[in-house]
């Protein structure tokens, strides 16, 4: 898959080591209960993720950038914590990863760690068409989607600790909507910024910010866009639709 991306013309590939997906389930002590060479100590839990990185590097060569998204915390009891996350970053750095992105949370246990702002359960119930799934969301949604108030640069403290430990480049993610936040992140030595919801609100974020020093993105972190991930029309910003209709 990585080789296909390179041959298709992409500039880099990102390996997902976080959010509760496959490689993350090996890294996290919450989900990795193995008793063989792939479970137990952090070195064992990192065995498969490091093999994945090695395989991708072998496929794309030394000149194609490989990024890795790691979790600073799983946000759940018994899960990954910042101290181990820093060691994960150091292992990936030593293995030759080109850049790291520090996120957090898990899709199945506590996704609001990386979303922040309004919770997703009400919006997911609204767009769900399966009556059984809709009922399930109503019952478990409030427990699964805990409320974490939005604040700018909510992963900055943990990302700094990783930055100070590794030699690879660093990509900041997490609450970077205001231009002041963008400036702060770059001044602190991060090499790139990864944007999600601000680009859903305004795909021309970068060009508009460059042209207007007083630019405001307009994302209010309602997370309604995220609840549309399974909707027939795909993900979009409902605020933009409402603004056009008014």
Listing of model-derived features with the role each one plays in the protein:
Residues 1-246:
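Flavin-dependent oxidoreductase catalytic cores
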């Amino acid at each position: 898959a990585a080789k296909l991306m390179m041959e298709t013309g992409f500039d880099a590939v990102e390996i997902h080591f976080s959010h509760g997906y496959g490689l993350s389930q090996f890294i996290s002590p919450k989900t990795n209960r193995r008793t063989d060479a792939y479970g137990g100590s952090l070195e064992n839990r990192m065995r498969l993720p490091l093999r994945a990185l090695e395989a991708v590097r072998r496929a794309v060569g030394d000149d194609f950038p490989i990024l890795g998204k790691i979790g600073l915390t799983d946000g759940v009891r018994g899960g990954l914590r910042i101290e181990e996350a820093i060691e994960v970053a150091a292992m990936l750095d030593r293995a030759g990863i080109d850049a790291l992105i520090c996120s957090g949370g898990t899709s199945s246990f506590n996704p609001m760690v990386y979303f922040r702002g309004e919770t997703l359960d009400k919006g997911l119930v609204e767009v769900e068409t399966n009556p059984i799934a809709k009922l399930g969301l109503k019952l478990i949604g409030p427990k699964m989607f805990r409320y974490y108030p939005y604040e700018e640069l909510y992963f900055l403290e943990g990302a700094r600790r990783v930055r100070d430990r590794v030699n690879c480049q660093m990509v900041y993610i997490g609450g970077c909507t205001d231009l002041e936040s963008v400036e702060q992140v770059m001044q602190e030595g991060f090499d790139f910024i990864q944007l999600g919801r601000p680009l859903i609100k305004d795909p021309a974020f970068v060009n508009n910010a460059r042209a207007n020093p007083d630019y405001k993105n307009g994302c209010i972190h309602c997370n309604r866009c995220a609840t549309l991930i399974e909707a027939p029309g795909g993900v979009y910003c409902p605020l933009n639709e409402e603004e056009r209709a008014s």
